């Protein structure tokens, strides 16, 4: 079967997909270059060259999909967008196969270790095992570096053909200051001859490459290749240090032995998912996000189009669903290391084959996917997918993920909302969105209260394993904070049992007279309770029953949205700096 030639998509029926990807790239660029969490649509018009009406329709569609967030007149990336990058990472199999080796090397060497893959004439990071110090040295998953300014780049360039070298020279001529690479400090003037070609020849001869402060002063790194079954370099494992601990020569002496010792096992692990995929192809699986699809199901994009009208770009929504489906797990679990056939994609998304084919060919044309005629006629996502917001969104902390949903909750119920974690026998507030009232609850980040007397504390204690909960209660000596505080340990045990069954806790004037609080758990990807979300109100604003009826549904919805973002953001790496919660 021939797929036929790929036509330029911009003026075709899937032009909206290309325009949508352009808007996402510009949002990412602005977030990376300017540190702008949110931008005006006019900024996107200037950056993409698209008409304002087109940008508005693209943004409206992306908001409906949950990939961007609107706050007044500003547009920002939303954490759910990371599911597109997760599709590539799952399909590649690299985090699962090589992540444990990176962690082990980082532990043994006490340095940050990463894995990078070739992406055009650059190196893009896909695995990160960070050692955090005052002087932190690490790249983010999704960051793209120019090949000539990093150690992995020399290893990848050793296998370039003349066409790839010509593309590299053209890129350097067009972008001499590396403005297209927000992950590296921009050059102040065009670089003279970097000696890159000589370093590439040396890397091909020795089997390793070094970065001696090419990215920025103080940063040194050593990389070695990890090869696939055909002998080609599939990726590079990279150790990063600082000149306060190593120079390039001492780092090389310290890490090359341990790196080379791990390479055979890493290459075997990299081959294992591919062999398993050949032996047990399994069912195609369905896309992991959005409404369920499949044969006989209504296309979610069509339903949204019918509801929202001309402002909704159905081709954009379908194209992103197709991209997500390339990394969706099959029923046997895991990603799709050898990609998916056109038939499998159509079945996973519920789209007609012709519709799925158009989207796939557009993704191939734009460099987000490839078609392997000789490998089961499968489509695979490519590392470029990670340019769609993955690196800046990967920097978000747990509290930063939660804040947008907390703001929506406060707007809906007109009461203050807080997020807390268990810290010994106390709860500690890690995020808060207040409301404006004449009478309001005044609490700041870092505030601590006894867990036994708070709704969030009871939710968190109820989420402990039975043995942990019993040990906590055994060491408890509750004091009455008001005349309503439950202080009898057996009664507290019963309250926690009920909280666990009900999935919420309502505390009425036990912490402070006049204060009522309702809390629900926030669970990580493993379904453990990792935090609690609450709404605090004055006890005089209604009965406890009316509080439950009016506030609990909205509170549970907000918690579910936080959980969804937490699962997406932590699927392949820990959350960014800030308050860390297990997931």
Predicted regions and their residues:
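N-terminal helix-turn-helix
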Residues: 2-86, 268, 297-392, 560, ...
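Juxtadomain coupling helices with adjacent low-complexity linkers
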Residues: 8, 31, 199-201, 206, ...
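Amphipathic alpha-helical regulatory segments at dimerization interfaces
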Residues: 26-29, 61, 97-108, 159, ...
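Amphipathic alpha-helical effector-binding/dimerization core
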Residues: 86-171, 386, 391-475
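Extended serine/threonine-enriched, polar tracts that run as long, contiguous segments within proteins
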Residues: 205-211, 223, 229, 235
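A short beta-strand signature within small-molecule sensing/ligand-binding domains used
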Residues: 217-225, 513-521
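Flexible loop/coil segments at beta-strand boundaries within sensory signal-transduction domains
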Residues: 227-233, 523-529
